[in-house]
Curated annotation (Swiss-Prot):
Family statement: Belongs to the aromatic-ring hydroxylase family. KMO subfamily.
Name of the top EC class for this enzyme: oxidoreductase
Pfam families in the cross-refs: FAD_binding_3
GO function term, MF aspect, one: kynurenine 3-monooxygenase activity
Gene3D superfamilies recorded: FAD/NAD(P)-binding domain
GO CC annotation: mitochondrial outer membrane
Organism (species): Aspergillus fumigatus (strain ATCC MYA-4609 / CBS 101355 / FGSC A1100 / Af293) (Neosartorya fumigata)
EC annotation from Swiss-Prot or TrEMBL: 1.14.13.9
Catalytic activity: L-kynurenine + NADPH + O2 + H(+) = 3-hydroxy-L-kynurenine + NADP(+) + H2O
Biological or metabolic pathway of the protein: Cofactor biosynthesis; NAD(+) biosynthesis; quinolinate from L-kynurenine: step 1/3
UniProt protein name: Kynurenine 3-monooxygenase
Cofactor: FAD
Length: 512
C-alpha cells in the first residue's frame, strides 16, 4: 500500500474554470492526487462575482471541446452538458433595405453540423459536480496564488474569507499556506498568476494586445408566452464596418447579446440616451424597440460594464517538469471564432496525450524517470500547441473583420458557395471551408491555415484562368464574326465556357 501511495503524483491545478476542471478530471482518472485552488468562491454559488463583474460572453462548444470532454471517459458528464446546449446551425445576418427589415441565414456546414450555445455556469457547474464526486480530488476556493518555487516544487496561497480583509501577522504579512506538488497546471485565465510566477523561472516570450474594441452585454427577454423572440438555432449578427451586435440563445429562451465597438463609439453612445437608441436604430435594425425596449437598452448599457478585449501569445508554455500553463493563461484569444473555450479544452486532451506517450504515468518508473518523462512531454506539448494556439489567435482576429462586414460581401459569399459545393459534390477532394475545419474537426489549427491558403490559391488560379480564357474567346469571336453573335448569345456562351473550365479544373484536382 505504501508503495502505491509513493508512486502517486500530486498535481496542483490553479483555476477552477472549465479548462482547469477538465485537467483535474484527466489527472484524477490517471491516479494523481489532485488539488484545485481557485481565487474566487465556489463558482456554483450564484453570489460568487465573476472576475470581470459580469456574465461572460456566451460560450460556443464545438467539436474540439466535445472531443476533449469525451476523452475524460465521463460519458454522463458529456451527455449532461450537451443536453443543456442549444444547437446553432448557422449565422442569421440582419439588415434593412429600403425601409424593410430582412434576415438571411448562412449555414455553417453543408452536412448540417452545428455548434452549441452553452451557458458558462452550466458547463462549469457540471464539471465541478463531477470533481466533487471524485475521491482523489480536493477543491479549495477563495485561495490566491501568491508565490511559487518551481525548482523546489512549492507554492504559497493566501486564503481569503469572503467579505473580510486578510489580517497580517506579526511580521506584517498576510498568512499563507505552503503546498508541495510534483507538477502544477496553471489554468487561471488571461491575467494568470501561475504564468506570472513561471516567468520568473522560464525565459518566456510574451506578447499581449488590447484591440480598440470594447464589449458590453445585453439581454433580449423571452416573449410574454415564454418563447424565443427570434430563431434560437442561429448566431444572430447585425454587422457594421466598425462595430457589431450579436445574439446567442440561452436555455431560458432569452438571448445573451454583445455589442462590440471602438472605445470612441462607446463614448458617443454614453453621451446621451438619444444617441444610444438612435445608433441602434440606424446600425442594428430590428433590435430596438422590436427586441429590446429603449428603456431596457439604456439601463443595460448604463449598468453593465464596458470591457476590453485582450489577446496574448507566449512561448514556452512550461518550465522543466514543474509547471505547464493552459487555456487563456497560455493563449487568450479574441471571441470571434468561438474557439477560446474549445482551444482550452483541446489543450488538456493534447497535454495528457503527450504525458501518456512519454511515459509520465509509468508506475514502474522511478520518480526521477517520471520527472524526466514529464519534462519531455511538456516540451512536446509546447512545440505542438504554441504553433496551433498562435494560429487560432490570428484566425480569431481575421474573423472579426469577416463578421463585421465580410459576411455581406459578394466575394465572401462566392468563395463560401464554391467551397461548400465542392465539399458536398466532390468529397474526394477533401475540400472544406476554413470555418468547417476549425469548428467541426480536430485538425490542428496550424494545418487549417495551410489548407485554407492552398484552397485560396487554387480558387484564385481557377478564377484567373477562367477570366483570361473567357475574355480571349470573346475577343476572338468578335474579331472573326463581329455580326454573327448578339451580346446576349455571347453572354450565354461565356457562361457555358466558364462553367466548363471550372468543372474540368476541379476534376483534374480531384484525380491528381
Amino acid at each position: 500500500m505504501a508503495d502505491t501511495v509513493r508512486k502517486k503524483q500530486k498535481l496542483v491545478v490553479v483555476g477552477a474554470g472549465p479548462v482547469g476542471s477538465l485537467a483535474a478530471l484527466y489527472a484524477a482518472a490517471r491516479g494523481d492526487e489532485v488539488e484545485i485552488y481557485e481565487l474566487r468562491g465556489d463558482l456554483r454559488d450564484p453570489s460568487t462575482v465573476p472576475l470581470n463583474f459580469t456574465k461572460s460572453i456566451n460560450l460556443a462548444l464545438s467539436e474540439r471541446g466535445i472531443t476533449a470532454m469525451k476523452h475524460s471517459n465521463r460519458e454522463d458528464l458529456v451527455n449532461n452538458v450537451l443536453r443543456d446546449t442549444i444547437p446553432m446551425h448557422g449565422r442569421m445576418i440582419h439588415g434593412r433595405d429600403r425601409g424593410k427589415l430582412w434576415e438571411a441565414a448562412q449555414a455553417y456546414d453543408v452536412h448540417g453540423r452545428a455548434i452549441n450555445a452553452v451557458d458558462r455556469s452550466t458547463l462549469n457547474n457540471a464539471l465541478l459536480d463531477e470533481l466533487e464526486c471524485t475521491p482523489n480530488v480536493k477543491l479549495f476556493f477563495n485561495h490566491k496564488l501568491t508565490g511559487a518555487d518551481f525548482n523546489a516544487r512549492k507554492a504559497w496561497f493566501e486564503r481569503r474569507v469572503p467579505g473580510e480583509a486578510p489580517l497580517p501577522n506579526s511580521a506584517n504579512r498576510v498568512p499563507e499556506i505552503e503546498v508541495d506538488f510534483d507538477f502544477m497546471i496553471g489554468a487561471d485565465g488571461a491575467h494568470s498568476a501561475a504564468r506570472y510566477h513561471m516567468m520568473k523561472f522560464a525565459r518566456v516570450d510574451y506578447q499581449q494586445e488590447y484591440i480598440d474594441t470594447l464589449w458590453c452585454e445585453f439581454r433580449i427577454p423571452p416573449t410574454e408566452d415564454g418563447d424565443f423572440r427570434i430563431s434560437p438555432n442561429h448566431l444572430h449578427i447585425w454587422p457594421g464596418r466598425e462595430f457589431m451586435f450579436i445574439a446567442l440563445p440561452s436555455a431560458d429562451k432569452s438571448f445573451t447579446c454583445t455589442l462590440f465597438a471602438p472605445a470612441a463609439h462607446y463614448k458617443h453612445l454614453g453621451s446621451s440616451p438619444q444617441n444610444l437608441v438612435e445608433s441602434f436604430k440606424d446600425h442594428f435594425p430590428g433590435v430596438c424597440p422590436e427586441l429590446i425596449s429603449p428603456e431596457d437598452l439604456q439601463e443595460q448599457f448604463t449598468t453593465n460594464p464596458h470591457l476590453p478585449l485582450i489577446s496574448l501569445k507566449c512561448k514556452p508554455h512550461h518550465y522543466n517538469s514543474s509547471i505547464v500553463i493552459v487555456g487563456d493563461a497560455a493563449h487568450a484569444v479574441l471571441p470571434f471564432y468561438g474557439q477560446g473555450l474549445n482551444a482550452g479544452l483541446e489543450d488538456i486532451r493534447v497535454l495528457f496525450e503527450c504525458l501518456d506517450k512519454h511515459g509520465s504515468y509509468n508506475l514502474d518508473a522511478s520518480p526521477d524517470a517520471r520527472r524526466e518523462a514529464r519534462a519531455k512531454a511538456f516540451q512536446a506539448y509546447t512545440d505542438q500547441r504554441c504553433a496551433d494556439t498562435h494560429a487560432i489567435n490570428d484566425l480569431s482576429k481575421q474573423n472579426y473583420l469577416e463578421m463585421r462586414w465580410g459576411v455581406k460581401t459578394p466575394l465572401y459569399k462566392l468563395r463560401k458557395s464554391v467551397e461548400e459545393a465542392l465539399d458536398r459534390y466532390v468529397p474526394s477532394l477533401g475540400w472544406q471551408t476554413q470555418y468547417s475545419r476549425v469548428s467541426f474537426s480536430n485538425q490542428r489549427y496550424s494545418d487549417v491555415i495551410r489548407s485554407a491558403r492552398w484552397q485560396g490559391r487554387i480558387l484564385a488560379l481557377g478564377l484567373a484562368t477562367t477570366l483570361i480564357s473567357t475574355v480571349g474567346v470573346i475577343a476572338y469571336v468578335f474579331w472573326k464574326k463581329p455580326r454573327q453573335y448578339s451580346p446576349l448569345s455571347l453572354l450565354r456562351y461565356s457562361w457555358r465556357r466558364l462553367s466548363s473550365i471550372w468543372v474540368t479544373m476541379f476534376r483534374t484536382i480531384a484525380y491528381a
